[in-house]
């Protein structure tokens, strides 16, 4: 959600700023812009829409300069127009900003009363005016930034240029991530390590409330109390190759097909197949004393949490609640002693989830996190860090991060069950064996790609689509519906199969495809009964099951998709493949922007 890159160096850097924005495209955006200091003035270029539009602006009107900031904007305040695109300039100050300034209206009204005039509808322009006001009052950039930061409420990451200080680039963060990079005679700011990947591998993650002064010679970090502090310098490991599609048409397609490998990599960190054991990192607390688990997440991660609830309650016999992160803090949840709060996030920076984590921490809960970015804010604040190893996920619609989350959550459920004495050694060995089978089963599921592509032609014309499942397949139904909504823009809903007769069955007619997730097993017969109720009312069913299930129930279906026969434990991991591929192929047929669907952002860093 929005992206920032800033460079201070000794050579013209317009092209490097632009390529940095390319690496930030995956975060989602609807406009973009850049600003440098050149010949004693702030020089800016902006464009609405895709980066190619900004590229054309730069081709017609190049942007020289040896210090600059650049930004991709995902609209929060004001429409996605050129006037609202960043950077924003007020007098001698240029600013780019990720996040939301919650008290911007109050600040704006005060500035208007003092005679300021605004060119945009954004909250960001308020920051530029406040800083310029301080500069006009005789403050230097450091004092101006320190004073203005204390007036801002909300979540933000900022990069700031001062026209009369071409040897100074300032950044700040509170509730939104910002990384600094160390170069040779130049230094960098970025929203994440990927933005800086080809420029440097030496980075520092700023902490909450930090602000930083970059010169060509060095970097000076200040904490929230304005004290100069040191932040650890680490090697990022990020590579520009991570944001290339290779031979695939879309990043989403590439990431779907990477799942056998990345799930295997993830499981390798948590399974000891020879011993038949799950091995988790040692937490800072005793997991055997946990009395309740509260899972908190958003979007696809929330559905991974729903699956985990089945596993934890079944194996560990510990009660589990699951909460939407955006709602968690606002219902005054009861936090009992002995509670574990489990937070799931691909980026580890999701604003709602991070705020919920801090709320749970304040309530005395132990904190575990499942994240794909082990250097993220959530990772740094956890008592138990459980990283996935999916690698960077560029497509906005999550695919490989989801299946890796499921792999980690299955391992966690097994570990809790063992330390609480709920599993025999043989039962744990069986679970480990079945989890180890998941990568091969994912490969087998991907082999049906062509068949799934053909079935997608029956879904693409639909206005509405329903997904149903039972047990752990119910969250998969909801995830499948979300995927279709996200990238094809078709209205879709996921339901527990048994709930259809309690209202949603009224939607059934011959124009509404119904995707049924029903691997053969204990819940198969009941799911098929629900499916047949819909067929009796003209519903056009696409049944996803294994060979046995298709033989038993596939005769009257519009189409069937045969998945490999797998143990029920790993069915949610394997059955993610067909719902992801269905959504992908429908979106391709409809010609939508698969990797950057409208109105969506990869990392939602505002509440």
Swiss-Prot record:
UniProtKB keywords: Aminotransferase, Cytoplasm, Glutamine amidotransferase, Repeat, Transferase
GO molecular function, one term: glutamine-fructose-6-phosphate transaminase (isomerizing) activity
Broad class of where this protein is predominantly found: cytoplasm
A GO biological-process term: protein N-linked glycosylation
Entries under CDD domains matching the protein: GFAT (cd00714), SIS_GlmS_GlmD_1 (cd05008), SIS_GlmS_GlmD_2 (cd05009)
Active site: 2 (nucleophile), 602 (for fru-6p isomerization activity)
NCBIfam families documented for this protein: glmS (TIGR01135), PRK00331.1 (NF001484)
Protein name according to UniProt: Glutamine--fructose-6-phosphate aminotransferase [isomerizing]
Higher taxonomy: Bacteria, Pseudomonadati, Pseudomonadota, Alphaproteobacteria, Sphingomonadales
Gene: glmS
């Amino acid at each position: 959600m929005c992206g920032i890159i800033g460079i201070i160096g000794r050579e013209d850097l317009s092209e490097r700023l632009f390529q940095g924005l390319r690496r930030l495209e995956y975060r989602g955006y609807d406009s973009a812009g850049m600003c440098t200091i050149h010949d004693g003035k702030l020089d800016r270029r902006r464009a609405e829409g895709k980066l190619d539009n900004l590229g054309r602006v730069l081709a017609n009107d190049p942007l020289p300069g040896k210090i600059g900031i650049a930004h991709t904007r995902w609209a929060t305040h004001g429409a996605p127009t050129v006037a609202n695109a960043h950077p924003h300039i007020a007098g001698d100050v240029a600013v780019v900003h990720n996040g939301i300034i919650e008290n911007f209206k109050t600040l704006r009204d005060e500035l208007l009363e003092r005679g300021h005039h605004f060119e945009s509808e954004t909250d960001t322009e308020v920051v530029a005016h406040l800083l310029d006001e301080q500069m006009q009052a005789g403050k230097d950039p450091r004092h101006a930034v320190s004073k203005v930061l204390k007036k801002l409420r909300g979540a933000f990451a900022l990069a700031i240029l001062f026209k009369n200080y071409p040897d100074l680039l300032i950044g700040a963060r509170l509730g939104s991530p910002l990384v600094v990079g160390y170069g040779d005679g130049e230094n960098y700011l970025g929203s994440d390590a990927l933005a800086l990947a080809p420029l440097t591998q030496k980075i520092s993650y700023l902490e909450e409330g930090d602000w930083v002064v970059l010169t060509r010679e060095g970097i000076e970090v200040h904490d929230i109390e304005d004290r100069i502090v040191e932040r650890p310098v680490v090697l990022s490991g990020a590579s520009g190759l991570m944001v290339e599609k290779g031979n695939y048409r879309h990043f989403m397609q590439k990431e779907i097909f990477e799942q056998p490998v990345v799930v295997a990599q993830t499981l390798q960190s948590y399974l000891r197949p020879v011993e038949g054991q799950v091995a988790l990192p040692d937490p800072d607390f005793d997991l055997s004393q946990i009395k309740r688990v509260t899972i908190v997440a958003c979007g696809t991660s929330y559905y991974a949490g729903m699956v985990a609830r089945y596993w934890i309650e079944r194996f560990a016999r510990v009660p589990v609640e699951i909460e939407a992160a955006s709602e968690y803090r606002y219902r005054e949840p009861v936090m009992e002693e002995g509670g574990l709060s489990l937070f799931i996030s691909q980026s580890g920076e999701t604003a709602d989830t991070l705020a919920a984590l801090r709320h749970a921490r304040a309530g005395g809960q132990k904190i575990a996190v499942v994240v794909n970015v082990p250097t993220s804010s959530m990772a740094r604040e956890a008592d138990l860090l459980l990283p996935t190893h999916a690698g960077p996920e560029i497509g906005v619609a999550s695919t490989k991060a989801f299946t890796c989350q499921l792999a980690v959550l299955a391992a966690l459920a097994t570990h809790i069950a063992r330390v609480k004495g709920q599993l025999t050694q043989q039962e744990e060995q069986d679970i480990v064996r079945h989890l180890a089978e998941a990568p091969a089963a994912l490969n087998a599921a991907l082999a049906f790609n062509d068949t799934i592509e053909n079935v997608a032609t029956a879904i693409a014309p639909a206005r509405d689509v329903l997904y149903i499942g039972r047990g752990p397949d119910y969250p998969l139904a909801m995830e499948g519906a979300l995927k279709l909504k996200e990238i094809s823009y078709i209205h879709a809903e996921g339901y527990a199969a048994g709930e259809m007769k309690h209202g949603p069955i009224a939607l059934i007619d011959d124009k509404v495809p119904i995707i049924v997730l029903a691997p053969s097993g204990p819940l198969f017969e009941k799911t098929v009964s629900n499916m047949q109720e819909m067929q009796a009312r003209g519903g056009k069913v696409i049944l996803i099951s294994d060979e046995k299930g298709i033989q038993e129930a596939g005769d009257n279906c519009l189409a069937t998709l045969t998945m490999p026969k797998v143990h029920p434990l790993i069915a949610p991991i394997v059955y993610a493949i067909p719902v992801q591929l269905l959504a992908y192929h429908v979106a391709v047929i409809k010609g939508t922007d698969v990797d950057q669907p409208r109105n969506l952002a990869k990392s939602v860093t505002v509440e």
